């Protein structure tokens, strides 16, 4: 059964994780509400990410290059590449995210969700959570 995790305006539905793929991949659908965005651009130390558009439109910045993700579009983010996204379309947007190898799991997102749900999160706490899970935040 898929696990659903909400982090503010972003909802993740985990379809597979490192736990059920023997570490091969993590896979989740990500809904981004209108005006939703990744609060901190970052890069991954230990995994690559492939994004596939399902519905709506998201704007990504990948390595300083703007990318518009529409339904059926796809792109690849190599580990070490700074990226971020936002939904400027005025409508819900959804994409499929595949992380390879599967080293993150849902644990990071669960922890982040709890901190965000408790109120305005301390940026130092968010940074510590990100670093502990292999994401390196980069100043915007």
Regions found by a protein language model. Name each.
Residues 39-41, 62-67:
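Short beta-strand segments
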């Amino acid at each position: 059964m898929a696990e659903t995790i909400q982090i503010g305006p972003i909802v993740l539905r985990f379809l597979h994780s490192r736990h059920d793929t023997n570490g091969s991949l993590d896979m989740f659908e990500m809904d981004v509400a209108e005006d939703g965005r990744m609060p901190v651009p970052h890069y991954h130390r230990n995994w690559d990410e492939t994004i596939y558009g399902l519905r709506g439109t998201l704007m990504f910045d990948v390595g300083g290059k703007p990318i518009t993700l529409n339904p059926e579009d796809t792109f690849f983010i190599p580990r070490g590449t700074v990226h971020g996204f936002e939904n400027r379309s005025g409508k819900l947007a959804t994409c499929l995210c595949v992380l390879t190898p599967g080293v993150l799991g849902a644990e990071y997102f669960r922890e982040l969700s709890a901190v965000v749900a408790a109120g305005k999160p301390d940026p130092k706490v968010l940074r510590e959570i990100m670093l502990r899970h292999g994401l390196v935040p980069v100043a915007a």
